[in-house]
């Protein structure tokens, strides 16, 4: 397996030289964004074991040696950034309706854990009952510089000013610039406009362009070069990847972090092709798998 990966990386070597001139340099050895690193990104925390996007989910991911914890951001009616995947409250809480129509005080009254016990009775635990929806501030207060953050701006068109609020929080917690280690925070989004805005506000803050399967089906070299003007990497649906398009993305000097990879065989195949990390609900599993590479 290691031999397969070495061969794939050798084929890409000429393209990877261009990585030195990406908007945010990521080639220094030991840097979290080095193409030599294989990153474990805990998708919504250790969400295969614990209710997603809860402090407990992130704590569990840390114990499982995840390199990054992933945060999806939504904004409340009163302008507070909370960590939740969906724009609506219904799936992961006992509330109903759109996040944007509720204040933070309203959302703090909700149970964000019991749904997991009901959906996955084989994984149910009493301590999941009553878990709360965390704010971005609460997550940064809890983990500070002791975690690396992979943060998605969700639905930025719905939440004007989200990017500025996010950057202000990162600055407050000294997670930008000289106060942080290179690559400690990565911003991702399906919205090119949101990432370009982040890049304009903070040129040294790494961004990753998320890609749907249909976008991968029509991906071109020109499109990848455009992504490279504002991002250090691409985050496609792993099911849309094959050896050829992995090689194409990497040849443009972009990091490649597909989502959401939960099967061990898929992990091995993607690593053999040359991805530089994955999003997974099972960070402990991927941490074990990548040791062979």
From Swiss-Prot:
Signal peptide start and end residues: 1-26
Catalytic activity as recorded in UniProt: a sn-glycero-3-phosphodiester + H2O = an alcohol + sn-glycerol 3-phosphate + H(+)
Deletion phenotype: Deletion mutant retains WTA and ceases growth upon phosphate limitation. Mutants show altered cell morphologies and effects on autolytic activity and antibiotic susceptibilities that, unexpectedly, also occur in phosphate-replete conditions.
Signal in keyword set: yes
GO terms for cellular component: extracellular region
Keywords assigned: Calcium, Cell wall biogenesis/degradation, Glycerol metabolism, Hydrolase, Metal-binding, Secreted, Signal, Stress response
Entry's family note: Belongs to the glycerophosphoryl diester phosphodiesterase family.
Name of the protein: Glycerophosphodiester phosphodiesterase
